[in-house]
Every structure is written in structure tokens, then in C-alpha cells.
Design a protein with these regions (language model features):
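Right-handed parallel beta-helix
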Residues: 96, 108-151, 156
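Beta-strand-rich solenoid/repeat architectures in extracellular/passenger domains
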Residues: 86-88, 109, 202
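Conserved active-site and cofactor/substrate-binding residues in soluble primary-metabolism enzymes
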Residues: 61, 119, 137, 189, ...
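Glycine-rich hexapeptide-repeat left-handed beta-helix
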Residues: 144, 149-152, 158-316
Length: 317
């Protein structure tokens, strides 16, 4: 029952929420991307017909389109925090640009951090930590409990409880992702519980300056983008010194080691890159439980079952 807004997972809307006061089907570029249900009405959809309302946003054809959404949405998303009560400029910080574009919501910032706010706001959420030796160039969002351990960070977003060091540009880190050492990550999407070994580096631009194509399980996908780094699935891991080519896809649960430069497509739950060896389900679950316990996250029966289903679905062939 309403009121409710139901959105397609493959569409990122822009602007303020819309309440047309009546049931409507949201449409973007000729496609149905959501529905709004007023209070007191029941939704029996999804429907592809009915009264429609045009809405602006970004269609997500695949994970790589999160990079386009990041470019288009992050500046405004960070700016939305500017009116919130916050801690102001931390003592000992160096600020380039308008200091009101730095929003600290209970973060811990060591002296000597550089905030470059000339191209966008920097938002540090509750419990975030930024160490000395860090330069943050907005727009940047640092999620609750995330630690920025040093380096140059620009135009990126980090979910909760990430660990980040080195150079990161125009990238999305989902929650609990770990990059605690030096190395460059650019125009990449890093899934939850990923661990990037020391020195892991992504290429985000072809030497030909041509558009990037992905190779996914035998299929080639045109991204239409000049800059695409790596798309790394949940719980994947890379060995120290790993070099990832432009447009590399590392699938869920894969453990990348055995070669400095892995192939551009690493299948789900791969164990190394030398052949077709795959992790066992029990082996994967044991590792996931160890990793989560280090972050004080309970490996519940529900979480275990969810990962079992993910393993089964991803390894059917």
C-alpha cells in the first residue's frame, strides 16, 4: 500500500523526489523505470502502461554505467549535505576553495590533511577517519566508519567501513572494501568485502585512447566510455603487485594470483589465474566468515545461505 515510490534497480534518478499526487509510471528515454503509488492505493504492478511522468536520470545498462552515474550524480549528492549541521573545518587542515564545502559529520581528521573543494564538496560521514598525508579533491563522499589511510583521492565515493590508501580516482567502493596499501585505482567499481593486495593497480585508459570493451564470459560489451578501470565483484581478492588491464572484470568470489597481469575476465570463484581451478563452496564460505569476523560482522545463518545461493547460481556451468 502507498505512499511508495518503486524504482527499477537499473535506473539512477536525478533531482528531488517527485510526488505527482496520483499513481504514475515513471518513464525515461521511452522505458518504464519506476512507479509512484499515493497513500491509500494498492500497487498490483509492475505495469508498462498507464499514466506516465517523465523523469531524469541515468540508465544502468551494466555495472560500468555506475561510473557515468557517479560523474553525473556525485556533485549534487555531496552538495545536498551542505545545509546539514556539521563540525566545520578540522583543526590543522589545509583547505583549497570554499571551506563551507567541507562537511564533517563526526569524523576524525588528523592535522595536515588537504581538502581541495574547488571542484566539489567533500563529505565525511559519522565515524570516518582521515589520516595525515591524505589529499581529498571533491566531490568525495566518505561513508561511516571508513578509514582513509593516506594518498590522493578524487571524485570518488566510499561506502561504510572501507579501508583506503594510495591513489583513487572516479571510483565507487561499496561497503567493507579493503585497499590498505599503495597502488592506483581509477574509474573502477569495487564490490563489498573485496581485498586489493598491496600495489594492486588498475589501468583506466587504453593506449589507443579508444572506447573500452569488456569481455564477460565470452561476450564483448561496448561500454561507450573512454575511461573504464576494473569491475571487481563481491568478496574477490587480488595478490600483491597485481596489474589489471583496462576494462578488467573480476567476478564474485574470485581469488586472483599466480600472474602479475591476469586475463581481462576472471570467472566467478576462480582460484588463481593459471587454469580453470575453482574454489569450493565450503572453502569460500570459510574465508568469508574469517574476513567478516575481522570487521566484527556476524556470519549469520541467513548470510551463509545467501552466499551459498550466490555460489550455486554463479557456478552452474
Amino acid at each position: 500500500d502507498g505512499p511508495a515510490i518503486i524504482g527499477a534497480a537499473w535506473f539512477a534518478p536525478t533531482g528531488a523526489p517527485i510526488d505527482p499526487g496520483a499513481a504514475r509510471r515513471f518513464v525515461h528515454a521511452g522505458q518504464t523505470v519506476g512507479w509512484v503509488i499515493p497513500a491509500g492505493e494498492r500497487w498490483d504492478g509492475p505495469h508498462t502502461k498507464g499514466p506516465e511522468l517523465a523523469i531524469e536520470g541515468v540508465l544502468l545498462r551494466g555495472t560500468f554505467d555506475l561510473l557515468t552515474a557517479l560523474e553525473e550524480l556525485l556533485p549534487a549528492d555531496c552538495a545536498d549535505f551542505l545545509a546539514a549541521p556539521n563540525d566545520g573545518v578540522p583543526v590543522g587542515s589545509v583547505v583549497l576553495g570554499d571551506p563551507t564545502h567541507l562537511v564533517s559529520l563526526g569524523a576524525n581528521v588528523e592535522p595536515g590533511v588537504v581538502f581541495d573543494l574547488r571542484n566539489g564538496a567533500v563529505v565525511l560521514d559519522q565515524g570516518a577517519e582521515v589520516r595525515n598525508g591524505t589529499r581529498l579533491e571533491g566531490p568525495v563522499y566518505v561513508g561511516p566508519g571508513t578509514r582513509i589511510l593516506g594518498g590522493f583521492i578524487r571524485a570518488s565515493v566510499f561506502g561504510s567501513e572501507c579501508r583506503v590508501r594510495g591513489e583513487v580516482a572516479a571510483s565507487v567502493f561499496l561497503g567493507f572494501a579493503n585497499k590498505s596499501h599503495d597502488g592506483f585505482v581509477g574509474h573502477s567499481v569495487i564490490g563489498p568485502w573485496v581485498n586489493l593486495g598491496a600495489g594492486t593497480t588498475t589501468s583506466n585508459l587504453k593506449n589507443t585512447y579508444g572506447q573500452v570493451r569488456l569481455e564477460v564470459d565470452g561476450q564483448r560489451i561496448d561500454t561507450g566510455r573512454l575511461n573504464v578501470g576494473s569491475l571487481i565483484g563481491d568478496h574477490a581478492k587480488t595478490a600483491i603487485g597485481t596489474m589489471l588491464a583496462t576494462g578488467t572484470v573480476v567476478s564474485v568470489g574470485a581469488n586472483v594470483f599466480g600472474t602479475p597481469m591476469p586475463p581481462k575476465y576472471v570467472p566467478p570463484f576462480a582460484w588463481g589465474c593459471a587454469g580453470s581451478e575453482r574454489m569450493t563452496e565450503d572453502g569460500f564460505l570459510r574465508i568469508a566468515e574469517r574476513v567478516m569476523s575481522r570487521r566484527n560482522v556476524t556470519f549469520s545463518a541467513e548470510r551463509r545461505e545467501s552466499l551459498r545461493r550466490t555460489f550455486a547460481r554463479s557456478t552452474r556451468r
